[in-house]
Amino acid sequence: MRSDMIKKGDHQAPARSLLHATGALKSPTDMNKPFVAICNSYIDIVPGHVHLRELADIAKEAIREAGAIPFEFNTIGVDDGIAMGHIGMRYSLPSREIIADAAETVINAHWFDGVFYIPNCDKITPGMILAAMRTNVPAIFCSGGPMKAGLSAHGKALTLSSMFEAVGAFKKGSISKEEFLDMEQNACPTCGSCAGMFTANSMNCLMEVLGLALPYNGTALAVSDQRREMIRQAAFKLVENIKNDLKPRDIVTREAIDDAFALDMAMGGSTNTVLHTLAIANEAGIDYDLERINAIAKRTPYLSKIAPSSSYSMHDVHEAGGVPAIINELMKKDGTLHPDRITVTGKTLRENNEGKEIKNFDVIHPLDAPYDAQGGLSILFGNIAPKGAVIKVGGVDPSIKTFTGKAICFNSHDEAVEAIDNRTVRAGHVVVIRYEGPKGGPGMPEMLAPTSSIVGRGLGKDVALITDGRFSGATRGIAVGHISPEAASGGPIALIEDGDEITIDLTNRTLNVNQPEDVLARRRESLTPFKAKVKTGYLARYTALVTSANTGGVMQVPENLI
């Protein structure tokens, strides 16, 4: 066993003394059992994580029952909804790397035989997956689960995105103070990840198709008995996989990454999943070309439209058959998925999901009646984004295939929000927000406030927004993010000027500023080099090492040190 490194031999008697002092070893034979880390992310200020201590206790009991010894440790967590719109958002994406580094440190320092990961919200899930790829120790994931959708006094379904859009509607005068407060009190009624197809739930669904989690991981409610039983079953399966030496990199292959993007297309998932899945591929040693994503989109139908793109919540998806029903439907179309891959269950993706039929065709559409014949995400290329940009086409009004407008440029998120709120931004504008990428932000902050304000003011079809920053999973409208290279790295988005005509073509997947190359070249000559916004602490180190979004926004060691 891997853990023999710390518990076998006379020279490890001091280590064994310390292990006895933990109280985790209940009998002399326990030293001969596998040591399993429980990588938890319990934290009081994140509603998606407040119940994870209870889930970890269930996992511990089941791991012992299965014949192994559990040791729990915790990672940090950032709630993107609470960190939104201020300096806190600069720490959100960088927290993913801290989580991966922290988990790697504990796992490798103590030579665990397996790891039970309990994530739930936005950056915690991908951070833990990065750790699993990096350490490549037998592992299983069981998330905390989504919260129930809220309900307004008028019987309208609510999610967190409803609240962000309500801010714009309240400022406009479209809703009363009483309606506004009612929504605030009822939008998030239970613990769990936010109820729509936002980043957290997108990633928790993708773990099913990647093969790292059990079926229904992405949709079973946080407060359900099914979630607790899933924890138990996952613990049993992990101990079995330790014995069989089934490792994360055996499961997460190039084909698994393809299938993750296919499910994302079918469910209209968050654009952040592109960023995180590319980072996962990078950590797994897979060189993944962004062009593959468009090829996947072309062959993958859009089957389930979930909040914020509709009123359906994750619980509605669960009741309609969950991710297994969507996977089963996609498997009926040859070439859409790679169903004979091994998964954490020890069975193939096909064996896990075959026969799981759709129970509600309003929530999950069948192959012969999709929302769209193509997937809900697109990668755009052009002279603004030579290395790619991402748009959630599932969140764009279906009548819009192209949008051409005049650029109105901002070098920060806050400047853009102020201009939207004071009505400087008008119909026909393309809002350009730059120097908000991984390096420029730093931390690639989410642009939910500006996009929500645009939609809340009734301009969702009349104003576009492009940025080297990223979006919340709750974002909808004509919103293009992840523009690469970013402005801070000298990307062409830095060359756009007010009044430039910009065309977003969703049919041909292009993003261009309609200026001659010689004009852009002259502008580049006078471009001021980027200077880091943060000079000390973690964000300064992050700025120095992070890459643009096309590689997942990962931190890379300088080539001269390799």
Curated annotation (Swiss-Prot):
Q: Name one Pfam family in it.
A: ILVD_EDD_N
Provide the binding site for [2Fe-2S] cluster. Answer: 121, 194
Q: In which pathway does it act?
A: Amino-acid biosynthesis; L-isoleucine biosynthesis; L-isoleucine from 2-oxobutanoate: step 3/4; Amino-acid biosynthesis; L-valine biosynthesis; L-valine from pyruvate: step 3/4
GO terms under cellular component: cytosol
Q: Where does Mg(2+) bind?
A: 80, 122-123, 446
Q: Which GO terms describe its biological process?
A: isoleucine biosynthetic process; L-valine biosynthetic process
Tell me the SUPFAM superfamilies matching this sequence.
IlvD/EDD N-terminal domain-like, LeuD/IlvD-like
Q: Which InterPro entries match?
A: Dihydro-acid_dehy_C (IPR042096), DihydroxyA_deHydtase (IPR004404), DiOHA_6PGluconate_deHydtase_CS (IPR020558), ILV_EDD_C (IPR056740), ILV_EDD_N (IPR000581), IlvD/EDD_N (IPR037237)
Q: Tell me how the cofactor is bound.
A: Binds 1 [2Fe-2S] cluster per subunit. This cluster acts as a Lewis acid cofactor.
Q: What is its EC number?
A: 4.2.1.9
Q: Key word Metal-binding present in the record?
A: yes
Q: Which GO terms describe its molecular function?
A: 2 iron, 2 sulfur cluster binding; dihydroxy-acid dehydratase activity; magnesium ion binding
Task: Please describe the quaternary structure of this protein.
Answer: Homodimer.
Biological role stated in the UniProt entry: Functions in the biosynthesis of branched-chain amino acids. Catalyzes the dehydration of (2R,3R)-2,3-dihydroxy-3-methylpentanoate (2,3-dihydroxy-3-methylvalerate) into 2-oxo-3-methylpentanoate (2-oxo-3-methylvalerate) and of (2R)-2,3-dihydroxy-3-methylbutanoate (2,3-dihydroxyisovalerate) into 2-oxo-3-methylbutanoate (2-oxoisovalerate), the penultimate precursor to L-isoleucine and L-valine, respectively.
In the record, the note on similarity to other proteins reads:
Belongs to the IlvD/Edd family.
Q: What is this protein called?
A: Dihydroxy-acid dehydratase
